Amino acid sequence: MWQPIDTLLDRFREDFGEPRSLRRLLAEQPCIAEPLAMPRQGVSANAVVCWHEWGAIGALSWPRLRPGEVRGWGPSGNRYASFTVHRPEFTQFGRCKEVKHWHCDIQDVQGLAAAKSDLTAFASLDAMVETHSPAMIADISESGLAKNLAHDEIRLLHRVNPSDHFAHYAWDGRLFLINDGGAHHFAAARYIAARLVKPVPLAGTLRRYSIDAQAVASLKRDFDLFAIPDQAEACNGLHDAMQALRAPYLWRRLPRALDGRRAIFLPRNTPRAVRAAALLREAGVFDLGEHLGDLLHRQASAAPPL
């Protein structure tokens, strides 16, 4: 007898904008408030979260959306229906500046894109070569340096118009060589050159990726942003709770390396969505808006490659 009455009371309170279902969901599924686990990066360029790609739509993405479109749900008359909106922030979220014939020293490179070793397992290129290729660094001399630099797979040194190039992710701060081979010989040459205090000049194309600060500011102005597990139980539970509250929300999967999470956008101009956001924040659900702000601060304070 009491359960139906409690249910009716909950529905009554939801009708007046109290997020009862959402509160119950957060109590029953604490996994929704798990912190955003960053991938183990080491010295791998492929483990850097590709925030510059967040606005792009991949060929295999679902739901199929045109550039700048975001899928959402909200009340529509007596129904709770899906809708699609165009948010220009996602057409300009990431930026890439390309510099041809860019120069640096081998010591400026802090990570690589490809190696036979697991690049995510090492804190530095020195640690990788010490662990897996000690023979390559046994001869700390100009001869040992020249031998490693002569390796044909270091394409930046031995190819005309090589595919290898430099990449700098402004929110990460490190410079990477996006290589197709020669990782251990490159790291060994870098190791030896540092101990000989000998410069090794490099030249190639630099691609500098950054997050558009205005796009982030616009999203944060219009929405409270959170990240939840991209799992059926969590996503369906949140959807049902928002439907019970009749509050709108938008969602979008996060970039590569964070593909186990999805972003939730709660409109700041809708009182019910604002109440839902306050409850998510109170429960400790990951604040994606704050995280993006931190990335921009890191991006602004990181020295760009010269």
Where are these regions (language model features)?
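Charged/polar, low-hydrophobicity segments characteristic of intrinsically disordered regions
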Residues: 42-44, 48, 219-229
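Short alpha-helix boundary/capping and kink motifs at helix termini
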Residues: 16-176
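N-terminal alpha-helical "arm" segments
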Residues: 1-25
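Short active-site loop/helix that positions an aromatic residue
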Residues: 183-199
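Charge-dense polyanion-binding interfaces
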Residues: 199-226
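Active-site neighborhood of thiol-dependent amide/isopeptide-bond enzymes
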Residues: 179-180
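C-terminal interaction module
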Residues: 227-306
